[in-house]
Amino acid sequence: MNPVIKTFQFGQSTVTLETGRIARQATGAVLVTVDNDVTVLVTVVGAKQADPGKGFFPLSVHYQEKTYAAGKIPGGFFKREGRPSEKETLTSRLIDRPIRPLFPEGFMNEVQVVCTVVSTSKKTDPDIAAMIGTSAALAISGIPFEGPIGAARVAFHESTGYLLNPTYEQLAASSLDMVVAGTADAVLMVESEAQELTEDQMLGAVLFAHDEFQAVIQAVKELAAEAAKPTWDWKPAVANTELFNAIRAEFGEAVSQGYTITVKADRYARLGELRDQAIAKFSGEEGQPSASEVKEIFGEIEYRTVRENIVNGKPRIDGRDTKTVRPLNIEVGVLPKTHGSALFTRGETQALVVATLGTARDAQLLDTLEGEKKDPFMLHYNFPPFSVGECGRMGGAGRREIGHGRLARRSVQAMLPAADVFPYTIRVVSEITESNGSSSMASVCGASLALMDAGVPMKAPVAGIAMGLVKEGEKFAVLTDILGDEDHLGDMDFKVAGTAKGVTALQMDIKINGITEEIMEIALGQALEARLNILGQMNQIIGQSRTELSANAPTMIAMKIDTDKIRDVIGKGGATIRAICEETKASIDIEDDGSIKIFGETKEAAEAAKQRILGITAEAEIGKIYVGKVERIVDFGAFVNILPGKDGLVHISMLSDARVEKVTDILKEGQEVEVLVLDVDNRGRIKLSIKDVAAAKASGV
């Protein structure tokens, strides 16, 4: 086919969508170019045969940044791209979340989306271009998809308001970084971090983005009108209404009773028994439904039971109403040898969170398309299988763990002190020890507590809460502090983190159309009420950061020297600074402006290194008395070392008031003596006296 090109204006940017020239064997392929600056190739391939045995929709999204896109060669021995970076993993999730709910229910054909950044500058993030390309590639592929979607990034400044698709430079000066995606009628996904913005400002950003990305949706529709392949002849399986009614008649009441059991393990055990009974009764013999079909229908009965109870005003699974937060149990300082720790328990969700302080050298080195940079703050989230009472894979972090860790990081990052105030590298690790809903928000609360326990001067405590939604027709219920089952069976996962003053992070995933501005306002209002409740209970345990660091934390001393003295501290080939580090067991970082940070495992080690540096950089003061060591004796006097690397001359006439025939009559090499600095000439030569020390002391020097 001949290439089809569609160009449109998106805010201040010109976007071009092209198909039919590259990757023509893919089911759908679109090359997206933004301002002749960022180019992303997006391909979609759909399997023709379904894979119903998997039990879930097999969609995979792979976002990859090629280093050649920025004119770079990969580092490392192999000199080629390796496993996905954290940025690539997070962007893959960002693209997956808004498109997944738009595939029809029951569609089980494998779909793979690959977004490849093939050209980019260092001005803007290519993720929005990749999301636009994904929407376009799906729209022309013929695969059943209820799109297209649009996407936009929003920044916010108090003076200028909202800004569409900002550059990296503009984002750095912004108090908001938000990505929004959705269809023409509804918002489906929000990912953001903010600096204590109000709920109204956050909602305004969502609505602003939705209005602005209508241009994307219209352009994709126009491209599809010219270049789309025929829509697949796919129809969902016909529902077995008779079997559904039979199982519900037999087990519906028991399922409803099962969902009144508040303890998760007991509830799961009872529902498992009922499920096994249903499978035994309605499947097995030839001509009867399969066990998987009965299991699927049983799951549908569970789904409807929980939802109907909630929208009809009945108590939730654990007996709460829609606005109540589960009971909290909060402890800090739970681990004796760590720098800061907290155990945060909310109902059956529990996080053990540990904060560790390190030196500037411990910062994470990131090799991105924009170049290398150091990250002094890390937040890692671990979700072991025992947290849900299961056996499972142990190993490196998966996509979910990386995503939850980044959300928790975004939530607390704005409240961390500036590097010049607190120049430590900070690592927070959240170990989820129990999970029944919203472990990421438990990590936020635990991280704030652990950081304050470690003595990190937080600007304000941070708490997070997960909201849910059940909507049936015109009826809906917004749920505060959702359980795992409510997350799975509900229509929305809406996480809000912030301080008492404002929002620091908002993440929203919506599974249905029809989420109105009113529903989002109610959710934000309930989230604020819950957040303030949690913060109040956290503040009763630890309301502000400890004034002193843990005795186990490294001691940091900051100082500044004259830039002319830097080479003296470093020494030839680094010999001097290396010797100081080896002898004191401290680590030393020197900046070009003379700023020095000394880190020691103990206060004594850091102080010893500081004194060594002061000794090297100190200048002899005229009129000051020093205790020096005789280094060398000559006929006309003695050279005395008064500071590291600084010797002065005591002339023979300055040794004593009495006449001295030989210097060795008064001094010997290695002897310690008190000397007075008489003068320092313009060549740095120091003139000393021993005989004038007594008079100087008498005068109060």
Curated annotation (Swiss-Prot):
InterPro entries assigned to the protein according to its UniProt record, in alphabetical order: ExoRNase_PH_dom1 (IPR001247), ExoRNase_PH_dom2 (IPR015847), ExoRNase_PH_dom2_sf (IPR036345), KH_dom (IPR004087), KH_dom_type_1 (IPR004088), KH_dom_type_1_sf (IPR036612), NA-bd_OB-fold (IPR012340), PNPase (IPR012162)
Cite the EC number: 2.7.7.8
Catalysed transformations (reactions): RNA(n+1) + phosphate = RNA(n) + a ribonucleoside 5'-diphosphate
Question: Where is this protein found?
Answer: Cytoplasm
| GO cellular component annotations of the record | cytosol
A molecular function (GO) term: 3'-5'-RNA exonuclease activity
Q: Where is the KH domain?
A: 554-613
Cell inner membrane listed as a keyword: no
| Co-factor(s) | Mg(2+)
Q: Which SMART domains match?
A: KH, S1
Instruction: Please verify whether the record's keywords include Nucleotide-binding.
Output: no
Top-level taxon: Bacteria
Assembly with partners or alone: Component of the RNA degradosome, which is a multiprotein complex involved in RNA processing and mRNA degradation.
Q: Which PANTHER family match?
A: POLYRIBONUCLEOTIDE NUCLEOTIDYLTRANSFERASE, POLYRIBONUCLEOTIDE NUCLEOTIDYLTRANSFERASE 1, MITOCHONDRIAL
Give the function comment from the record: Involved in mRNA degradation. Catalyzes the phosphorolysis of single-stranded polyribonucleotides processively in the 3'- to 5'-direction.
Specify the protein name.
Polyribonucleotide nucleotidyltransferase
The organism that produces this protein has a lineage beginning with: Bacteria, Pseudomonadati, Pseudomonadota, Gammaproteobacteria, Pseudomonadales
